[in-house]
């Protein structure tokens, strides 16, 4: 997606050969017009997939997920990272390791919102090692629902997440595929 690649070139900051900071438009400050374009593109890509729900992880996946849900006309569920007094009943949970934060979290979704008739689209801001995607897939499977596909805003293709998801037979659509961050320069797979 050219608009996204351009935004990454202009406002993304390469912190290391492994880390790309995009807090100017995606995961701290949000560019609503760009999020709308992202939602439109995911909706186009998954229009014929029979999606009934979208699942993401709080917080950075919420904006692109909501824009996609708006366009597809389906609800968005975000897996919570933190315990809530209102989120208590027999939760669907999975552990996820954050590459960027170097921490392990348990994410949870209420089983009231997912069931076996759902076809679920996973939306996330980044795909690196695939741990967040695998955690969401685990939760979807616990509910007996079907994974319709994964929509990734930015994929770090030089890490193993995409290959693992591909090998498991999941459809992955990434809007920007980063080949390398070497030398402080973002290189895309075209």
Swiss-Prot record:
The lineage of its organism: Bacteria, Pseudomonadati, Pseudomonadota, Gammaproteobacteria, Pseudomonadales. Keywords: Cytoplasm, Glycosyltransferase, Purine salvage, Transferase. Homodimer. Pathway: Purine metabolism; XMP biosynthesis via salvage pathway; XMP from xanthine: step 1/1. GO terms for biological process: purine ribonucleoside salvage; xanthine metabolic process; XMP salvage. The gene is xpt. 5-phospho-alpha-D-ribose 1-diphosphate binds at residues 128-132. Its EC number is 2.4.2.22. NCBIfam families: PRK09219.1 (NF006671), XPRTase (TIGR01744). Belongs to the purine/pyrimidine phosphoribosyltransferase family. Xpt subfamily. InterPro entries: PRibTrfase_dom, PRTase-like, Pur/Pyrimidine_PRTase, Xanthine_PRibTrfase. Converts the preformed base xanthine, a product of nucleic acid breakdown, to xanthosine 5'-monophosphate (XMP), so it can be reused for RNA or DNA synthesis. This is Xanthine phosphoribosyltransferase. Coiled coil: none annotated. It is an enzyme of class 2 (transferase). One of its GO terms (cellular component) is cytoplasm. CDD domains: PRTases_typeI. It catalyses: XMP + diphosphate = xanthine + 5-phospho-alpha-D-ribose 1-diphosphate. One of its GO terms (molecular function) is xanthine phosphoribosyltransferase activity. Xanthine binds at residues 20, 27, 156. Gene3D superfamilies: 3.40.50.2020. It is found in: Cytoplasm.
């Amino acid at each position: 997606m050219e608009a996204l690649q351009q935004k990454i070139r202009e406002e993304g900051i390469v912190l290391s050969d492994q880390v790309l900071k995009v807090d100017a438009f995606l995961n701290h400050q949000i560019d609503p017009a760009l999020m709308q374009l992202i939602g439109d593109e995911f909706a186009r890509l998954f229009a014929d997939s029979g999606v009934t729900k979208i699942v993401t992880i709080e917080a950075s996946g919420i904006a692109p997920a909501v824009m996609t849900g708006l366009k597809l006309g389906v609800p968005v569920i975000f897996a919570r990272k933190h315990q809530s007094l209102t989120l208590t009943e027999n939760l669907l949970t999975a552990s996820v390791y954050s590459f960027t934060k170097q921490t392990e979290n348990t994410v949870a979704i209420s089983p009231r919102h997912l069931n076996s008739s759902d076809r679920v689209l996973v939306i996330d801001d980044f795909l690196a090692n695939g741990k967040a995607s695998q955690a969401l897939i685990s939760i979807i499977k616990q509910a007996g629902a079907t994974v319709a596909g994964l929509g990734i805003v930015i994929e770090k293709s030089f890490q193993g997440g995409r290959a693992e998801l591909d090998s498991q037979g999941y459809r992955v659509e990434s809007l920007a595929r980063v080949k390398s961050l070497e030398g402080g320069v973002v290189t895309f797979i075209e």
